[in-house]
């Protein structure tokens, strides 16, 4: 569903059996309709107009999540995503990455293009020490 000028995700909210969805390069602002897609394992929301991914908090089966090139400022919604392995949240408005510290399956995270705080940069070093591949500004 990439590059289709999609704005309204309401029709997709009924696809509760879907486990892989790519919605990159659209005009999405509201992800609330995706909140029931709890079987989702891989989700691409890159290059949209999203500010809040909070409605995804119950998508705890996610293993790969890409939302680069949006306007997201908080990672709090990933706190319970224990299966999340790969996260691309580059080019957003993220300053705090502390929710990533409690994700045991995380192997790769892309953070470049975010206004990371000094504390977030220290957290990135902690992730690297744990063996996570971190792509971030120095």
Residues covered by each model-derived region:
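Concave beta-strand-loop units of leucine-rich repeat
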Residues: 1-7, 11-95, 99-122, 128-138
